[in-house]
Amino acid sequence: MRKHPILYEISIRPWLYELSKKYSKTISKIKEIPLEEFDILKNIGIDYIWMMGVWKLGKIGLELDQQNDYSKILPDCKKEDIIGSPFAITEYECNPEIGDNNDLLFLKEKLHEKNLKLILDFVPNHSAIDSPFAKSNPEFYIRETNINNLNNSKFYTTTGFYFDKDPYFDPWPDVIQFNYFNENTIEFMKNNLIKILNFCDGVRCDMAHLILNEIFIKTWNKQLENLNCKIPKNEFWEIIKEIKIKYPDKLFLAEVYEDNLSQKLINLGFDYCYNKELLDKLMYGPNEVNEYIHYKNENFFNHVAHFIENHDENRAIFNFNNIDKSNCAGCICATIGGMIFFNHNQFKGFKNKLDVHLRRANDEKENETCVQFYNKLMDIIKDDAFKSHNYYFIYNVNGNDLWKLIA
C-alpha cells in the first residue's frame, strides 16, 4: 500500500463533454461514464480521483460568466461552451445536469470496485449569490448594515451581501461570503461537510486558510464589528479531528498558498495542504529548489500535495515554456514525498488551459515526448521504494553533476 496517495483532478462537466467526443455519443450524466475510463486511471497508478464540480449551481453566476469574453482562451468560444463556475454552489446537492445524489453514491461504489477513492469539493467560504440560504438565513453571511450605502459596489450585492474575497485580491462577483463568526453559520457548514462525506472518501477544501480566525478577522474586521460579532473560541477546522474519531480514513486536502498557514492547517487535522511554494521555486530554478528543500523537514513534505498544474494554474508546459523543464519539475513533485497531485490531461502535454467556466479548452495535439515521459515516470513511482517513502534526503553538497535517472 502506498504511504502517500496519487491524486488525479478531473473537472466533471468538461470531462463528460470530452468523453462524448471520444465515444461519439452523448455522455452527460455520471451513470453514462464508461467504466473502462476508471480502469485506465487505476492502471496508470491513480489512487484518488478528485471529481471537481459535482454540486448544484445558481443561474446568476452563469449569466455573469456569459457576459465575459473568453476569446483569448478559446477563440471559437460559443455561448454553450460557458458553463459557470463550479465553485458558485447554491447547495450541496448533485448538479441535476449530471445526475442526482444517488448517482454520486453510484460513482463512489464503482470507484471502490476498482480500488479507487473519491474526493469531492467543500467550498467553505461562500455560496452562490442565488443560494436559497441567502433568503432563508441571511445571518449566515457577511452583510452591509448601512442600508443607505447599498449602491452599486464591487464589494457587495444590491441587497448588501458581501462578495467573497481573498484579503489581497478583488472580490469574486458570483459568490457571497459566509460569516464564520456566527454560531449558526458554523453549525450549518459543519453539517454540510458531514453531508458531503457521505458521498465520498475525502474533501478538497477550497481556500481553506481564509476561514482561519486570524485571517478571517483580518479580511472582515470592519464588517464583523458592524455586525457585533466576536471571535470564536475555536477554529472551524477543529471539526476534522472530531470527524476522524468516527471516520479515520476520510482524507482532507486544503487549498492554501503560504507554508506557515499550511502548518497551522496540518496541526488542525488536514492530511495534506497545497505546496504552491514548491511550484514557485521550480519556476525559478534549481538553486531555489535546493534551498527550499534544505530548509524544510521531511515531516512537512509528508503533509503537502505537490503539483505543477491544476485548474487554477496554467498548463505546466506553458508555464515552464520548455517540455524538459516541465518534465523535470513533474519528476521532482512525484518523488519528493507527500501526496502526488496530477491534473487531467497533464500527461498529454497540453499547453492550452481549460478555464473553470468553460466546458472545453482550445484543441491541440498530444505531445508525444510528454506522453512517453509520464508513461516511464508512472511505472517508476509504482516501485515499492516510492510507495513506502522510507528514504532520506541526501544533499549534493559539492554541487557536482549527478547521473540522471530519467533522461
Where would I find each of the regions flagged by the language model?
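Active-site and adjacent substrate-binding regions of carbohydrate-active enzymes
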Residues: 1-407
